[in-house]
Regions:
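Acidic-basic catalytic patches of nuclease active cores, encompassing PD-(D/E)XK
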Residues: 1-42, 70-73
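Catalytic cores of nucleic-acid endonucleases
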Residues: 2-9, 66-111
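Non-catalytic C-terminal interaction segments of nucleic acid-processing enzymes
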Residues: 3-7, 21, 55-58, 106-173
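Short, conserved, surface-exposed binding loops centered on an aromatic residue
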Residues: 40, 49-55, 91-95, 103
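Short connector loops at helix/strand junctions that flank enzyme active sites
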Residues: 43-45, 57-61, 74, 95-98
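Conserved catalytic cores of phosphodiester-cleaving nucleases, focusing on short active-site segments
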Residues: 48-72
Length: 173
């Protein structure tokens, strides 16, 4: 899939907005902070910080990378890789340093929550099996050329523990 450059901000904005509303509606939420434009977090590919109260009453903060997707029919996730890095090194498999990747399919209002600790381990083991995107399917973004791997959703759901799929109710018009 290839997005036109002008479509990218709208997709990302719509996904982040829907996810933020969903998180804010949860009773355990203390705050949701959009840090996508903060250079400190942008460099680490982190978009949101979610502070929530745990069952024991303490607060915890989770970092989230948001990925918006209009085309849910491919059966694959696009996992961002580190641009310009050695493709075979484990460090190059995933660009984000976030705790979670929230992969949101806009037309279906379906959110896939991928725990990045488990994902990193799985990608270290299996990343070389995944197809890496090459031009012309790489995206020229504000952060440089976006490269990545196409990873089967079905395979990840089978092989990586902790992935959740949530239906987000769209906001009433």
């Amino acid at each position: 899939m290839v997005y036109m450059r002008e479509d990218l901000p709208a997709v990302a904005r719509d996904a982040a907005s829907a996810i933020t509303r969903w998180l804010e509606a949860m009773p355990e939420t203390v705050s949701v902070r959009d840090v996508a434009d903060d250079p400190q977090y942008r460099a680490r590919h982190i978009d949101l910080l979610w502070t929530r109260r745990t069952t024991d009453g303490t607060c915890t903060e989770e970092s989230i990378r948001v990925r918006g997707e209009r085309y849910g029919h491919t059966g694959e996730y696009h996992i961002e890789a580190v641009s310009g890095a050695d493709e075979t090194s484990p460090e190059s498999m995933v660009a984000t340093e976030a705790d979670y990747l929230y992969y949101y399919f806009l037309p279906r209002a379906e959110l896939h929550i991928l725990p990045m600790q488990q994902m990193r381990g799985w990608l270290r083991e299996h990343g070389a099996e995944m197809r890496q995107l090459r031009p012309p399917t790489v995206l020229d973004s504000a952060d440089g050329v976006e490269v990545g791997r196409l990873v089967s959703r079905d395979r990840l759901l089978r092989e990586v523990g902790g992935i959740r799929v949530v239906q987000i109710r769209p906001r009433a018009a």
